[in-house]
């Protein structure tokens, strides 16, 4: 058993070395693939039908990625074999050819994508889903097979197939023809645009050239006419005459303009003078009218009517100065009998209400004020006494005259005297 295990390990090591050698060989394949892609490009130029056949072949191939993976999984399992020499099996060949190293694989995919990008859009597909069989072309040869092997693992990157109508399914050649016609139309359109630009430039040159020629011819004619007119004596005379006539007309027109402007200035000045005169007259007339109105407004007063009488003159009334009666102080009150000298003199009695009201009022005045009030009260009492004495004297004089004139009518006169004395006493009390 131990010897068999050693043989199996040795065989597996040899197999790994063979795989590495095969991978190293595959590393040198991209150069050959590049040549093959160039050949395929030349083959594409020969005709679009070969491209369609190649694409159909690539579609018919089975997915090599999945099959190879299954094969490698089987190879990785330990296989028990009897003792013997290790022979190179086709499994290892398929593995080495389909799975090169990573760097080479990435480069191959890029180159294969570059080689097959123009092919993906040219897949002819029938509406029913059946794929047309294409005859293999003899011109492509082995290079087409190599490109198909490289592009086989890239089947997943191809564009998804869309269902096409029955009219489009009549043949793939119609699509190819349409695309060719489109490319031809685009090329012709570009050429037409270039030709149109060149023609417009030529037309512009042609249009500008005759204009320049006409301008040059006009300048030549002008120079010729001036030289002929100045060279000949008749031309000189005519030019001198025309210049003199033209200058004479200019002078006449200038004189007429001056006269016209002078007349306009005179008219304007006259209008301004008239305006000033009218304004002055209007001011004078306004002043005169105002004076007339003032004179017309003045009128003479007519005589007063007979029934109108002036009111009598008002009599000026002498106002008696108002004085406040001040109540005398209690305890210092003098009797009225002391003031009056006799029975004939009327007694002055003050109302009780005023005395009672004065008694009820409390005394809250200070001493200096009381002294001043006492002095004023004494002065007033003296004045009253003097007046009463004068009244009594007058009454006595009247009595004497009355007795001398009419001794019989003494009684009524005495009554009248008493009434007058009472009136005078009341006046004295109010006035004092």
UniProtKB/Swiss-Prot annotation:
Residue spans of biased composition, Basic and acidic residues class: 11-60, 176-194, 215-224, 270-291, 387-411
GO cellular component, one term: endoplasmic reticulum
Region (Disordered): 1-251, 270-416
Composition-biased stretches (Polar residues): 135-150, 354-370
Bias type Low complexity, positions: 86-100, 225-248
Expression sites by tissue: Expressed in seedlings.
UniProt record similarity statement: Belongs to the TPX2 family.
Biological role: Microtubule-associated protein (MAP) that regulates the orientation of interphase cortical microtubules.
Descriptive protein name: Protein WVD2-like 4
Taxonomic source organism: Arabidopsis thaliana (Mouse-ear cress)
Name of the coding gene: WDL4
């Amino acid at each position: 058993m131990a010897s068999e295990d050693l043989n199996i390990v040795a065989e597996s090591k040899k197999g790994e070395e063979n795989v590495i050698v095969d991978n190293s060989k595959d590393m040198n394949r991209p150069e050959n693939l590049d040549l093959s892609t160039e050949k395929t490009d030349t083959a594409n130029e020969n005709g679009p039908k070969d491209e369609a056949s190649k694409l159909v072949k690539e579609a018919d191939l089975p997915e090599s990625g999945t099959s190879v993976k299954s094969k490698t999984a089987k190879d990785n399992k330990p296989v028990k074999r009897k003792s013997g020499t290790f022979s190179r099996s086709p499994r290892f060949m398929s593995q080495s050819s389909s799975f090169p190293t990573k760097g080479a694989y990435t480069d191959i995919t890029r180159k294969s994508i570059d080689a097959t990008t123009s092919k993906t859009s040219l897949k002819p597909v029938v509406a029913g889903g059946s794929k047309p069989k294409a005859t293999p072309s003899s011109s492509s040869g082995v290079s087409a097979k190599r490109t198909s092997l490289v592009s086989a693992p890239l089947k997943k990157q191809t564009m998804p197939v869309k269902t096409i109508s029955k009219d489009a399914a009549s043949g793939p050649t119609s699509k190819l023809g349409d695309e060719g016609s489109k490319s031809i139309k685009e090329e012709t359109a570009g050429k037409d645009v270039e030709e149109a630009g060149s023609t417009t430039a030529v037309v512009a040159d042609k249009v500008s050239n005759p204009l320049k020629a006409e301008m040059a011819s006009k300048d030549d004619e002008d120079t010729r006419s001036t030289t002929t007119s100045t060279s000949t004596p008749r031309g000189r005379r005519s030019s001198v005459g025309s210049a003199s006539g033209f200058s004479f007309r200019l002078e006449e027109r200038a004189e007429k303009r001056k006269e016209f402007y002078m007349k306009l200035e005179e008219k304007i000045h006259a209008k301004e003078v008239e305006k000033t005169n009218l304004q002055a007259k209007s001011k004078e007339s306004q002043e005169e009218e105002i004076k007339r109105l003032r004179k017309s407004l003045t009128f003479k007063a007519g005589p007063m009517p007979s029934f109108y009488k002036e009111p009598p003159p008002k009599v000026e009334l002498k106002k008696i100065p108002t004085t406040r009666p001040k109540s005398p102080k209690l305890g210092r009150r003098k009797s009225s009998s002391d003031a009056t000298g006799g029975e004939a003199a009327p007694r002055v009695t003050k109302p009780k209400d005023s005395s009672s009201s004065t008694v009820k009022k409390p005394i809250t005045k200070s001493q200096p004020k009381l002294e001043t009030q006492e002095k004023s009260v004494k002065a007033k009492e003296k004045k009253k006494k003097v007046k009463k004495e004068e009244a009594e004297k007058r009454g006595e004089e009247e009595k004497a005259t009355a007795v001398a004139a009419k001794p019989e009518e003494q009684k009524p006169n005495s009554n009248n005297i008493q009434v007058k004395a009472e009136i005078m006493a009341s006046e004295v009390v109010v006035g004092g």
